């Protein structure tokens, strides 16, 4: 019984994944990384800002942008 439930849940998840792929809703690892970078908040005093970010002097936090 327990094995049947586990297999059923696995099959449902597998079907949902194929549905997402057919609808073009696949979330690639690159999209996940991009979303995390959007929320990147680093202190300029402690760390240099990564490429593509500048230090906001008022808040002392890195923000997307260029000089």
Curated annotation (Swiss-Prot):
Show the GO MF annotations.
Answer: toxin activity
Q: Give the signal peptide as a residue range, or say none if absent.
A: 1-24
- Keywords for this protein: Cleavage on pair of basic residues, Disulfide bond, Secreted, Signal, Toxin
The protein in question is named Kappa-scoloptoxin(04)-Ssd1b
Its chief place of residence is secreted
Q: Which family does it belong to?
A: Belongs to the scoloptoxin-04 family.
Subcellular location, record wording = Secreted
Disulfide pairings? 44-55, 49-62
One GO cellular component assignment for this chain's record is: extracellular region
Species for this entry: Scolopendra dehaani
Q: Which residues form the propeptide?
A: 25-36
Per the record, the domain of life is: Eukaryota
Q: In which tissues is it expressed?
A: Expressed by the venom gland.
């Amino acid at each position: 019984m327990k094995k049947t439930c586990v297999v059923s849940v696995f099959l449902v998840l597998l079907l949902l994944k194929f549905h997402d792929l057919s609808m073009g809703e696949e979330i690639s690892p690159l999209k996940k990384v991009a979303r995390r970078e959007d929320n990147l908040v680093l202190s300029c005093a402690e760390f240099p800002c990564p490429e593509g970010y500048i230090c906001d002097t008022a808040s002392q936090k890195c923000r997307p942008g260029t000089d």
